[in-house]
Amino acid sequence: MTTTPELLAPAGDEECMIAAVNAGADAVYFGLRDGFNARARAANFATEELPRVFDYLHAHGVRGFVTFNTLVFDSELALAEKTLQAIARAGGDAIIVQDLGVAKLAHEVCPQLALHASTQMTVSSPEGARVAASLGVTRVVVPRELSVEEIARFSAGTDLELECFVHGALCMSWSGQCLTSEALEARSANRGQCAQSCRLPYDLYVDGGRRDLGDVKYLLSPKDLAAYALLPELLKAGICSFKLEGRMKGVEYVTNIVDKYRRALDHALNTNAKGLDANDEQELRLTFSRSFGPGFLKGSDHQTLVHGKYPGHRGLEVGRVERVEQSRGYVYVNAVPDAPALFPGDRVLFDQQRPEENEPRGSLFGVDDLGKGQLKLVFGGEEAGRRGSGADLDRVRVGDVVYKSRDIALARKLKRIAETERKLAIDVQVSGRVGELLQVTARDVLGRSAQTQSALPLAAATSRPLDRALITEKLCAFGESPFELRTLSVDLEGAVAISPSELKRMRRALTDALTEQQTPRAPREVTSARALSRFSVSEAASRPLLIPLLRTIEQVDRAIAMKDELGLVDIELDFMELVGLGVAVERVRAAGLKVIIATPRVQKPGEEGYDRRFRKLAPDGILARHLGAVEHFRHDGEGRLHGDFSLNATNARTALTLLDLGLTTLTPAYDLDATQLLALCEGVPASKLEVTVHQHLPLYHTEHCVYSHTLSKGKDFRTCGRPCEEHLIHLQDTQGLQHPVIVDVGCRNTVFNAKAQSAASVIGKLLNANVRRYRVELVRETTDETAHVLTAYRELIDGHIDARTAVKRASAIEKYGVTSGTLHVVTA
């Protein structure tokens, strides 16, 4: 357990790791090349390097955490176990994990290996933390969507350590709940392959018409988080680890953020330490920023979280282009007040309000201050004979905004910090009296200690006596050694004398003794996990169920009218804003059907009232979409609790873990393809699975409200005027697809895929595997469309039509047709 606040730094490669250590990190986190980490495109580390990596970190008093924060498939569990064993044996301090089954697996393999729940696990409340703790988790990385106040509530309700991101890129979607890359790019963010779809431009459509927003095009691209000023508040709220994002960034960026946040955290812990000033913030902006903000830590502000003008790095604004002399390599700029100074070697960028294109940028050969706020920037030019890394001036236009994007002097300073080896702090105690040997003890931050004594007894001083200043100068001047003095305790009786050369000899004896001591690896018991049973397919005893998941009262009425034709037993209700939910429950119950209510996708501290509202409606079951709901409802009685896709079960260990928590049925995660889904059916009783066979995949699930941002001036639900009650927004992507945006009871937005996805082609194999529950999800389909889709899948399940016919019939009502999705389904 962490006893003092920790600065946790990213390391995408070894150079960044060394830089983070030298810049002052208390711990670093990194991923492995074997996979299982959410930054698959980073250089990462080889598993066989782990002993050397941890030895290096521990020798510098730094902890090392391995990211294991992706979902794992059944075919990968053996490698996952082997990798976890290697991490434990190498001396890893913790793993950061997303997959619930992997957390349980790691705890079986090595109980002494600390488990940290990644933001990808979506542990957003104390109730969810209790589930995580039951699997062996000791720390939760809180979601970026929580405010300081909500974090304080979280902390008050759990004994687990809490870790918080304080700097870096923000995801638009709740971590672990983003399916955009999966749906649109066939690469899963839950597998470390995020396609950065939130950084793309989107057109806004309101009630079917395009709304012109000028240069605001990046509606889902948040500013970067910069919370250095909030560290004191976060400390009071209960945060023990302050996490910096950036495993995909380079060494300059890592050095800069660690150096700055080291000082900011030291200042938060001791106000006598120097904090950050305006120049420090400018330096943070120069290594990377999309503009800075507090994220959600100060609560929701939908007007400032996203500016929408650009998705990438800018830096510091210099001014606007007034004139270009291309052949001479000159660009004349009208500078803004307080424009940053420019020097040869600095890089600038020309913002042309088309960031999706390759914007002109380059390094400066020279800068002339012409006075009255006018600058002449000198680049390469044919006429001037300057060649090299100049900007592409033929694309620079009058009016372009000029940004300073890199500072060469800052780069040199950061290089020195990154390459200056970090020293270990040691505490020294000195004692002695006349006629006795001088005794010296030193202890470093790793707990290693060494003692030495003078060769001869101390004599009475006849000139300068031994004092604190002389001890500091001769005994504690550790110079080129890997140590530096932290505290000095002196206990001398009387005026004693010793030669400076003897003090130097004793210093060398101390440093040699400490250096020779190897940092011991804590003894650990590493075992193999118990094998899982394989489940045989038993003969089906009942007609497979079609389970409609409905979102409007009109859909409910139509489904009830067709209940006998469709063979309905259960209806799942996902009334996202809860409006009309009570009426729908009554109608389903009056029709003699069982009603299952879906919870919101996430629940934050202070939102427990939703669960009480659901319980008051007395449904036949709850469709739990977050771990807090699992904890809240799992003691309500057998048969009442169903787990949804958002619990992210992609392997048998995770599925069985969730079923052991009290779930009656479970919908597998949408990251599985057909082969993986069928493999899951072999490791879990297939009768316990509910498979979604038709849906509009929920791409993003966001705390940010597009309605509030674009259709109001309000910053949150209290001031936005609720435009979501009067309008329907679609976001049109670069392919021309218009994705509907639906608001839930927590004012969170779900962006649904414009295209429907079908699993029709695998239904036959699922039936053979004894899967009995088949869900069809609707979003805003009309009553006729509801009947059309439900009938097609009922007939397919009953064997009256084939998969191709079912898909063709489902496609008939879809504007963009039906896609195969990840299950490789046949299409019409």
Language-model regions: role of each:
Residues M1-A23, A27-A40, V53-F54, H60-T70, ...:
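Surface-exposed amphipathic alpha-helical tracts and adjacent flexible/coil segments at the periphery
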Residues F45-P51:
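Glycine-rich, highly charged phosphate/nucleotide-binding loops
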Residues C110:
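Conserved phosphotransfer cores of two-component systems
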Residues V123-S125, A226-A227:
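Active-site glycine-rich loop that binds ribose-phosphate moieties when present
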Residues H107:
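Short glycine-biased active-site loop of nucleotidyltransferases that positions the nucleotide triphosphate
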